[in-house]
C-alpha cells in the first residue's frame, strides 16, 4: 500500500476542495492514486448532493460581473447565512458571474453547461460545492444585460452582496449609472416605467392602499382627526387626458370657491396639479423606477433628475437573495437542532 503523506493529502485537497479526513480516506481507498481519489470523491459528492436536493436553500449571495459591453448578475443560494460568508462559496459565486458574462447563455440549462475555471461544468461545480461545504448549494438565476459603447453600466452590490444590481444609462457617466443602481438597490423598483405595469396589478395594489387608508382612518377617528379620502387612481396609466382635465377644472372651482382672484390662478394651479399627480400615482412610486423620488435628490423623481442631466435609464436588473423563495419551517438550522435534540434523548 502506498504511503499517504501529508503532501499527498494537501495536493488532493487543493484539487478537490475536500476536507482533510475525506481526502485522506479517499487516498487510502485508492491506494494513493490522486486521479482515482478525485473520481471517488466526486462520486461520493454526487451521492451527498442528491441527499440534500430536497432541502430549501434561501440564503446566499448575488454576484455581479462586467465584461466589456456585457454584464451579468447572478443569485446563488445556500441553506444558511453562515455558509454564504464562506470563502469557497464567495469564490464560486464570483466565478459563476464571470463565466455567465463571458459565455452569455440563453437560459439556466445553457448556464449549467458552461465550463468553470476548474474545468468542471457549472452544474458539476455546484454538486462538488454541496459535497465539500456540507449544505445544498444551488445556482438559482441570472440576468444578462448588454450595452453599446456610448452607454454606461452601473454595477452595485449592497448589504454584503445580498442585493445585486446592474443598470444601463444613456448619457451621463459611470458614476451616475452607479448612483442609479444604488437607488434601485434601496428602493426596490420592479420595472422601469408605468407602461410596464399590468392593469389588474394596479387595481389590486390600489385596493390595498385604500385598505391601509381605512385602517388609518379608524385610528384617526379615535383621536378626533378627520378621515382621509380614498385614492381614485394609482398609476399614470389611469390618468387619461379627460381625468387630468377634470382635475384641473376641479382645482379652478376650488380656487373660485375660496375667493382667489383669477389673475393668480396660473401660479397656483401647477403646484396643485403636481400634488394631484403625486397623490394618484402611488403604485407607480412603489414599483416603477422613473416615478420614484430620487434618493440622491429628493426634490425630484428619478425621471425628472435624469432629464435635468440629459440622461435616461435603458434597462436594469435587481436581484435580492431569497426573494420569492418560500422557506420551509423545517429548514437546515431547525434540522440540526432536531438532530441534536434526538441525540440527547429530548423531544
From Swiss-Prot:
One of its GO terms (molecular function) is translation elongation factor activity. One of its GO terms (cellular component) is cytoplasm. InterPro entries: EF-Ts_dimer_sf, Transl_elong_EFTs/EF1B, Transl_elong_EFTs/EF1B_dimer, Transl_elong_Ts_CS, UBA-like_sf. CDD domains: UBA_EF-Ts (cd14275). The keyword Cytoplasm applies. It holds the Pfam family EF_TS. Keywords: Cytoplasm, Elongation factor, Protein biosynthesis. The keyword Zinc does not apply. Residues 80-83 are annotated as: Involved in Mg(2+) ion dislocation from EF-Tu. It is found in: Cytoplasm. Associates with the EF-Tu.GDP complex and induces the exchange of GDP to GTP. It remains bound to the aminoacyl-tRNA.EF-Tu.GTP complex up to the GTP hydrolysis stage on the ribosome. Belongs to the EF-Ts family. This is Elongation factor Ts. It comes from Streptococcus gordonii (strain Challis / ATCC 35105 / BCRC 15272 / CH1 / DL1 / V288). The gene is tsf.
Amino acid at each position: 500500500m502506498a504511503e499517504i503523506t501529508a503532501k499527498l493529502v494537501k495536493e488532493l485537497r487543493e484539487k478537490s476542495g475536500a476536507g482533510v479526513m475525506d481526502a485522506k480516506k479517499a487516498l487510502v481507498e485508492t491506494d494513493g492514486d490522486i486521479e482515482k481519489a478525485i473520481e471517488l470523491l466526486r462520486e461520493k459528492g454526487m451521492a451527498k448532493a442528491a441527499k440534500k436536493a430536497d432541502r430549501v436553500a434561501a440564503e446566499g449571495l448575488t454576484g455581479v460581473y462586467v465584461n466589456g459591453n456585457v454584464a451579468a448578475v447572478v443569485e446563488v443560494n445556500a441553506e444558511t447565512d453562515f455558509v454564504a460568508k464562506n470563502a469557497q462559496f464567495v469564490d464560486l459565486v464570483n466565478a459563476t458571474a464571470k463565466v455567465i458574462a463571458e459565455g452569455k447563455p440563453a437560459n439556466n440549462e445553457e448556464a449549467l453547461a458552461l465550463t468553470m475555471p476548474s474545468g468542471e461544468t457549472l452544474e458539476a461545480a455546484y454538486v462538488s460545492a454541496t459535497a465539500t461545504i456540507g449544505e445544498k448549494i444551488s445556482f438559482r438565476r441570472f440576468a444578462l444585460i448588454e450595452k453599446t459603447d456610448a452607454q454606461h453600466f452601473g454595477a452595485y452590490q449592497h448589504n454584503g452582496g445580498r442585493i445585486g444590481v446592474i443598470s444601463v444609462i444613456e448619457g451621463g457617466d459611470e458614476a451616475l449609472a452607479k448612483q442609479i443602481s444604488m437607488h434601485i438597490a434601496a428602493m426596490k423598483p420592479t420595472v422601469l416605467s408605468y407602461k410596464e405595469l399590468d392593469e389588474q396589478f394596479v387595481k389590486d395594489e390600489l385596493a390595498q392602499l385604500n385598505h391601509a387608508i381605512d385602517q388609518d382612518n379608524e385610528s384617526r377617528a379615535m383621536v378626533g382627526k378627520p378621515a382621509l379620502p380614498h385614492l381614485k387612481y394609482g398609476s399614470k396609466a389611469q390618468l387619461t387626458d379627460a381625468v387630468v382635465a377634470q382635475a384641473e377644472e376641479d382645482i379652478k372651482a376650488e380656487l373660485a370657491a375660496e375667493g382667489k382672484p383669477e389673475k393668480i390662478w396660473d401660479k397656483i394651479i401647477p403646484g396643485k396639479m403636481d400634488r394631484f399627480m403625486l397623490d394618484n400615482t402611488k403604485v407607480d412610486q412603489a414599483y416603477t423606477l422613473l416615478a420614484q423620488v430620487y434618493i440622491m435628490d429628493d426634490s425630484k423623481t428619478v425621471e425628472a433628475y435624469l432629464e435635468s442631466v440629459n440622461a435616461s435609464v435603458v434597462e436594469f436588473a435587481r436581484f435580492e437573495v431569497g426573494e420569492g423563495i418560500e422557506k420551509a419551517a423545517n429548514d437546515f438550522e431547525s434540522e440540526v437542532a432536531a438532530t441534536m435534540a434526538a441525540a440527547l434523548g429530548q423531544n
